[in-house]
From Swiss-Prot:
Disulfide bonds join C50-C104, C63-C115, C81-C130. GO terms for biological process: actin filament polymerization; angiogenesis; cellular response to osmotic stress; central nervous system development; hematopoietic stem cell proliferation; negative regulation of apoptotic process; negative regulation of cellular senescence; negative regulation of smooth muscle cell proliferation. The lineage of its organism: Eukaryota, Metazoa, Chordata, Craniata, Vertebrata. This is Angiogenin. It comes from Mus musculus (Mouse). CDD domains: RNase_A_canonical.
Length: 145
């Protein structure tokens, strides 16, 4: 008994409809991660840098309490999800090597713009969440012991 190509074609078409939105969702979460946490070549890493970057990246409506920018190339950050990372706690990855980072902390006051931030710069290991080999959430950073 031969199966007609109709049902197989229907399964194939349904697969095309279901898979791309999932991949697009992963890509949009990765893009959001990069917008919020990646700055390859920072110009200054002081309080003004934080105020400028937080505003430029639309993280000031309302003023975000804390945000960390990772300085380095995207492929090295992405590699934390693979060879440059180790499992850490539940579903997280910790970088094997430290990254140059700038953490911006809201100095208080109104949660409405203009937002004022204090910068803290250093080399730290970063902890991120990954989905399908892409970073999608920044969890924390800390100095190596």
């Amino acid at each position: 008994m031969a199966i007609s190509p109709g049902p197989l074609f229907l399964i194939f078409v349904l697969g095309l409809v279901v898979i791309p939105p999932t991949l697009a969702q992963d890509d949009s979460r990765y893009t959001k991660f990069l917008t919020q946490h990646h700055d390859a070549k920072p110009k200054g890493r002081d309080d003004r840098y934080c105020e400028r970057m937080m505003k430029r990246r639309s993280l000031t409506s309302p003023c975000k309490d804390v945000n960390t920018f990772i300085h380095g190339n995207k492929s090295n950050i992405k590699a934390i999800c693979g060879a440059n990372g180790s499992p850490y706690r539940e579903n997280l990855r910790m970088s094997k090597s430290p990254f140059q980072v700038t953490t911006c902390k809201h100095t208080g006051g109104s949660p409405r713009p203009p937002c004022q931030y204090r910068a803290s710069a250093g080399f730290r290991h970063v902890v991120i969440a990954c989905e399908n080999g892409l970073p999608v959430h920044f969890d924390e950073s800390f100095f190596s012991l």
